[in-house]
Amino acid sequence: MHLFSIRFFLLLITFGFCFNSQAAEQPFIEVVTSDSFSVTGINALQQQGLSVKVYNLDDGKRLVAQIGANLPNNQNAAKNVLQQRFKKMGDKQVKAQFILAYQAVTLSTQYGLSRYPAVVFNHGESVVYGETNLVQALRLYQQWKAK
């Protein structure tokens, strides 16, 4: 019985390494872009089981414009309207929206990106600049990785 337990344990460890190595081979992909660029190939990569996250540098400006829309010209009145809007939305919701809206800026700084669009692989391991076709960006990454 003890020998069976050891074999079963070794078998589980072997499968664990196999699954972990397969997961490690699939890159995690983040795209930093703006409204000026049309990113293609997202669905094709997701259908291959790849994780793709797209962050837009214009989301922050868009959120500020949305929240600040139709504010009165008077500064005190505008402040009151904003406070009412934030209260209606809830503090946690407002914070979450701002964090999401500025995530592209945060990632750009974190990864030291010098321009965009940028396709980032594996949390900054490699960056492909200027390519908006994610299938092509992945191909370039795989060629680089194979060298």
Residue ranges of predicted features:
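A short, hydrophobic beta-strand/beta-hairpin element that forms part of a small beta-sheet core
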Residues: 116-127
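N-terminal secretory signal peptides that target proteins for export/translocation
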Residues: 1-5
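Local sequence-structure signature of Cys/Sec-based thiol-disulfide redox active-site neighborhoods
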Residues: 23-69
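Structured segments of extracytoplasmic/periplasmic soluble domains
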Residues: 45, 110-111, 119, 140-147
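Bacterial N-terminal signal peptides
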Residues: 6-20
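Conserved segment of the thioredoxin-like fold in thiol-based oxidoreductases
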Residues: 66-96
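Thioredoxin-like thiol-disulfide oxidoreductase module
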Residues: 86, 90-114
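C-terminal partner/receptor-binding element of secreted or periplasmic proteins
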Residues: 127-147
